[in-house]
Design a protein with these regions (language model features):
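ABC-type ATPase nucleotide-binding domains, specifically the catalytic core motifs of the NBD
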Residues: 1-14, 22-24, 136
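Conserved ABC ATPase signature
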Residues: 33-37, 41
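ABC ATPase C-loop
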Residues: 50-51
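Conserved catalytic motifs of ABC-family nucleotide-binding domains
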Residues: 54
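Catalytic Walker B motif of ABC-type/P-loop ATPase nucleotide-binding domains
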Residues: 58-62
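Helical segment within the ABC ATPase nucleotide-binding domain
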Residues: 73-85
Length: 136
C-alpha cells in the first residue's frame, strides 16, 4: 500500500487504515507477500494501492478476471463501496450483468465498436441486449 502513496505520503498511516477498513482481508494478510495471496486478494491489494493516491477517477481493467464467483461478488461490493466515496470508476469488465448492476452508465462494444450505451439499469432491462449479451 505504501507503494501506492508515492505521490503524497502526508497521511500515509491514516490512508492505510482507510484501506484496511475498505478491504479487511488486506489487514488480515498484511504480513504476507502479495504473491502468496489469492487472485481476489491480489486484486483487492491492487485496487487499494491505486486508492492510496486519493484519486478522482479509478480505472479498473477486468477486476474480476480469474476469480471465483464468491470473490467476484465481493469485489463488486468493494466497487460499490468505492463508488459511494464519490470516486468515478471507469471499468472494463467481461461480466456484463454484474458490471451493469453497479454502473451509472454502460457501454457495450461489439468487435471493438460502441454498439450500445445508456444507464446501467436501462441496458440491463433492454430485451435485445439481454438476449444478445446477458443470456436472456
Amino acid at each position: 500500500l505504501e507503494m501506492g502513496a508515492f505521490i503524497n505520503d502526508d497521511n500515509l498511516s491514516s490512508r492505510i487504515e482507510e484501506m484496511y477498513d475498505l478491504f479487511p482481508i488486506i489487514k488480515e494478510k498484511k504480513d504476507q507477500f502479495a504473491g502468496e495471496l489469492s487472485g481476489g486478494q491480489r486484486q483487492q491489494v491492487a485496487i487499494a494501492r491505486a486508492l492510496m493516491t486519493n484519486p478522482d477517477v479509478l480505472m479498473l481493467d477486468e477486476p474480476t478476471a480469474g476469480v471465483s464467483p464468491v470473490i467476484m461478488t465481493e469485489l463488486f461490493q468493494h466497487i460499490l463501496n468505492i463508488k459511494k466515496q464519490n470516486i468515478a470508476i471507469l471499468m472494463v469488465e467481461q461480466n456484463a450483468r454484474q458490471a451493469l448492476e453497479v454502473s451509472d452508465r454502460g457501454y457495450i462494444l461489439v468487435t471493438g465498436k460502441n454498439a450500445y450505451e445508456g444507464k446501467g439499469d436501462y441496458l440491463l432491462n433492454d430485451k435485445d441486449i439481454r438476449k444478445a449479451f446477458l443470456g436472456g
